[in-house]
Amino acid sequence: MSDSILFAFSLTLLAGLATGIGSIIGFLSKDVNPKMLTVSLGFSAGVMLYVSMIEIFVKAKDALSVELGDKAGYIWTVIAFFVGIFVIALIDKLVPAYENPHEMNTEKIIEESSAKDKAKLLRMGLFSALAIGIHNFPEGLATFMSGLSNPTLGISIAVAIAIHNIPEGLAVSAPIYFATKSRKKAFVLSFLSGLAEPIGAIAGFFLLRTLFTELTFGLVFASVAGIMVYISLDELLPTAEEYGEHHLAIGGLVGGMLVMAVSLLLFL
């Protein structure tokens, strides 16, 4: 296995394991700093939006233009971009809102857990773990492909997705812990949901390695850009605003874009 593949896989694994951090927060503390969470999620959205539109979309277009010509290359980049959005939106739609970790208020779970039926809480946590696993699969592919293309790009996306995964880990562990009072169960299930990211990377690698051409790279990368834009707009920003002030979320967003822009400029 080449160093670049090992590096990209390691990034994906670390990003996925960030759900474990969220799970620890879920059963060790009832006090999640909402302002810090708002800024962090906004920052993550900024990184992902900037890199999707400025770097990944452009790389996809360049790769497809080499194979298909400028006009056809651009058309197929746009098509693949919206296919990526459609796929992740469909996954999101197929997960019922109550069990979807992106539709849940984890603060409310913590505050009202004593009044809830424990079996219902446990079911919520288990379905949240399943939902997060489904969502993390394409995110793992996005991180892996980015790491293969450009180490700096891969690190930035891995950090953004890791930040995104922390509240997801909390969404799994909080209901399971308050239902079972078992830290071990809460941590293990949250941890396993995060492993869907490296599994997505492995699956993507084995499926695409025999077909890996400029055309394949361009189509997959454009789809990855669409997936990341959807995650940012549908999950990260709404969740950031739910936990804190609108302007804090936007400040984090701009900060993430700025940091990403500077980091890309430094490695030109």
Curated annotation (Swiss-Prot):
Q: Where are the transmembrane segments?
A: 5-25, 38-58, 72-92, 124-144, 152-172, 187-207, 211-231, 248-268
Recorded GO molecular functions are: metal ion binding; zinc ion transmembrane transporter activity
Q: Cite a single Pfam family from the UniProt record.
A: Zip
Q: Enumerate the UniProt keywords alphabetically.
A: Cell inner membrane, Cell membrane, Ion transport, Iron, Membrane, Metal-binding, Transmembrane, Transmembrane helix, Transport, Zinc, Zinc transport
Q: Where in the cell is it found?
A: Cell inner membrane
- Which residues participate in Zn(2+) binding? 139, 164, 168
List of residues binding Fe(2+): 136, 139, 165, 168, 197
InterPro entries named in the record? ZIP (IPR003689), Zn_transptr_ZupT (IPR023498)
Q: State the GO CC annotations.
A: plasma membrane
Q: Where is the signal peptide?
A: none
Membrane topology per the record? Multi-pass membrane protein
Q: Which reaction does it catalyse?
A: Zn(2+)(in) = Zn(2+)(out)
Question: Its biological function?
Answer: Mediates zinc uptake. May also transport other divalent cations.
Which family does the record claim for this protein? Answer: Belongs to the ZIP transporter (TC 2.A.5) family. ZupT subfamily.
**Per its UniProt record, what PANTHER family does this chain match?**
ZINC TRANSPORTER ZUPT (PTHR11040:SF205), ZINC/IRON TRANSPORTER (PTHR11040)
Recorded protein name is Zinc transporter ZupT
Q: Which organism is it from?
A: Chlorobaculum parvum (strain DSM 263 / NCIMB 8327)
